[in-house]
Amino acid sequence: MNIQALLSEKVRQAMIAAGAPADCEPQVRQSAKVQFGDYQANGMMAVAKKLGMAPRQLAEQVLTHLDLNGIASKVEIAGPGFINIFLDPAFLAEHVQQALASDRLGVATPEKQTIVVDYSAPNVAKEMHVGHLRSTIIGDAAVRTLEFLGHKVIRANHVGDWGTQFGMLIAWLEKQQQENAGEMELADLEGFYRDAKKHYDEDEEFAERARNYVVKLQSGDEYFHEMWRKLVDITMTQNQITYDRLNVTLTRDDVMGESLYNPMLPGIVADLKAKGLAVESEGATVVFLDEFKNKEGEPMGVIIQKKDGGYLYTTTDIACAKYRYETLHADRVLYYIDSRQHQHLMQAWAIVRKAGYVPESVPLEHHMFGMMLGKDGKPFKTRAGGTVKLADLLDEALERARRLVAEKNPDMPADELEKLANAVGIGAVKYADLSKNRTTDYIFDWDNMLAFEGNTAPYMQYAYTRVLSVFRKAEINEEQLAAAPVIIREDREAQLAARLLQFEETLTVVAREGTPHVMCAYLYDLAGLFSGFYEHCPILSAENEEVRNSRLKLAQLTAKTLKLGLDTLGIETVERM
């Protein structure tokens, strides 16, 4: 149920009847304050100006045509021409009933699209670090939301599995006689990578062999391909452990690494030349883009093939976008890549559009994100100033949560304690990130994220268990409640019901904008509204059974909405805390 969409259409029709153009925007928004109703239509200002009318005069005319019978109990004009809409308690009660009768809580299924989501993208032969956290969990929240809405989602883990470094790694693997690399841990590979690089920099003979190995690998030699495959397999096996710990939905089947696009690159360069988009410049193949200027104010040159014949990330990204449209049949492509890559992506996509590889009707969206910072406001590092490994961060989260949970539940059995600590610890790390607007940097703070107050995972998980405890005390099951009517008489009942029915609107925003913090804010607000409702509207000690059961149904929908909402974020809920 999308009340905002329903009201938007009703107000739009009334505006047209009042003389507004057919493409007018009613600008219906959820009201920020209770006194302004549940929704506000703010579109009169812009339209009245075009019509040469006062906004309030237009609003008055719109009201004469606006039929919200059975939807709103009151509609009023406020200020210079805002229209405030107060939802009818009977309408709220009816739709709460409908939401409870549906597995999807009344959320409609939009027109199905094929959506490719590019996220996580770790590098082969390197362990995942905190820099991979945001892309992985924000991308996963978007994927879960889009899938819940009914879209076909293709997860694309754009792994860094190709490049000149593989000659060096294979040469070092061979030199160390480590053909048993399948048994290596990725932690070994981290040191292995450093040692290989050191050797490459200091031993010219080794470096020459490494360069030859790159050529052999790129020409498809079976032995070198097998060695490369070992390095990829070890890396992805270790990364899968991290994905599983993080409760994200990526699997080995979702790997679409850089190597996938290699066979396409010569054809892309030849085609761009044939189309007159790419030209030779100082021995390299370059596309000059008028949209981007260099310091001299001239069109910027984007290299797609180096003088030595090598390709660049841009070339791969052009091939990648083409593949996602032509082969995966994407209707929309989302890239969860940090903000520092924005210009690079814009240049690659400008070439993609000019070449006609992806039509303008298929959006290519950079859902960029900021950095994770330490309390000092600088990039998050270890005490020694090194990069924080993601596995180490999750270990620390688990350890801190274990202490916190044990303190609050000294008699809890060990296995239950471990399960709860895992849900709280991993949930805290994820929620602290997801609850921030992804476009900004954020401060990583253990104390804040593990607090039981404020917009945190522990608070949200606790809020959910608190609602469940009402049911346990009521000693009533869902079947017994099903036939009971919902009656809304108190203001706090109406406020909670209206917010519950805004779940679909929240999902729609997350799906459209790729902003999980909007869902976090909604759930936090919902938990707060339930708390006020619980305090002022007695449930178990209600004046009669009818009111008791009605309030239990509001509590029931609150629990289901909190659980489903946290689910779309990849945050685990627990029955008791």
Curated annotation (Swiss-Prot):
The keyword Protein biosynthesis is assigned to this record: yes
Enzyme class: ligase
UniProt-listed Enzyme Commission number(s): 6.1.1.19
A biological-process GO annotation: arginyl-tRNA aminoacylation
Gene Ontology molecular function: any one: ATP binding
Keyword annotations: Aminoacyl-tRNA synthetase, ATP-binding, Cytoplasm, Ligase, Nucleotide-binding, Protein biosynthesis
Reactions this protein catalyses: tRNA(Arg) + L-arginine + ATP = L-arginyl-tRNA(Arg) + AMP + diphosphate
Residue numbers covered by motif 'HIGH' region: 122-132
InterPro entries xref list: aa-tRNA-synth_I_CS, Arg-tRNA-ligase, Arg-tRNA-synth_N, Arg-tRNA-synth_N_sf, ArgRS_core, DALR_anticod-bd, Rossmann-like_a/b/a_fold, tRNAsynth_Ia_anticodon-bd
GO cellular component: cytoplasm
PROSITE patterns noted in UniProt: AA_TRNA_LIGASE_I
Gene3D superfamilies: Arginyl tRNA synthetase N-terminal domain, HUPs, Isoleucyl-tRNA Synthetase, Domain 1
UniProt keyword Cytoplasm present: yes
CDD domains registered for this protein in UniProt: Anticodon_Ia_Arg, ArgRS_core
Subcellular localization, as worded in the UniProt entry: Cytoplasm
One Pfam family in the UniProt entry: tRNA-synt_1d
Superkingdom, taxonomy of origin: Bacteria
UniProt similarity note: Belongs to the class-I aminoacyl-tRNA synthetase family.
Assembly and oligomerization: Monomer.
Entry-linked NCBIfam families: argS (TIGR00456)
Protein name from the UniProt record: Arginine--tRNA ligase
